[in-house]
Amino acid sequence: LGGTLSDREKRQLAARDMINKLNNDISGLSRVVMGESSRLESLKNITERYDGYGNSIRKVMEQKDRYKGIVGVVADIIKTQKQYETAIETALGGTIQNIVTDNEETAKGLIAFLKQNKFGRATFLPLSAISGRDIRVDSSLTRENGAVGFANQLVECDSEFTELARYLLGRILVVDNIDNALAIARRHNHSLRIVTLEGDMLS
């Protein structure tokens, strides 16, 4: 009888060990499932957030965890008040969808990623390539009749992106309406890039 009880105890211990192992496996799988669900939710959010963008831009933004040097698209970095939105969007043009990176190496890696996977092309703006660029403008232009200011003066961004805003918008004068814009353009022999609050562009 003692031997029988010992065998039974062994079987119970083995069964208990098996149950514990299965529970551990289930916990591990649950963590994996939760991790994948979180990742899928993150990818879904990126897809929805960049719905109006090209496929290549969405694919790059999905790599943000892998490439820490991805800063974001210009539209996420440079903001402006409602009354200037049309003018700033026009001034930025296609660059509004450019992808900002910390440096050229990150941009190079992402270009290779797009090529290898045949995801198309994207335009990158490495902050390291913009840093220190001298952008000279005639500040007296802001005193012209109807002038609102240079476009980079009408946007908001974190201080680390001030040079980016100046690089993209620092040479574009925002003017209140087309009549004043034409008058300023004529006075300066059409040598300026001007955008009106309604989005008319002169260059």
PLM feature spans:
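Hinge-like oligomerization/junction regions that interrupt long coiled-coil arms in large cytoskeletal
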Residues: M34-S203
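Extended, EK/Q-rich alpha-helical coiled-coil segments that serve as long dimerization/scaffolding arms
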Residues: L1-D51
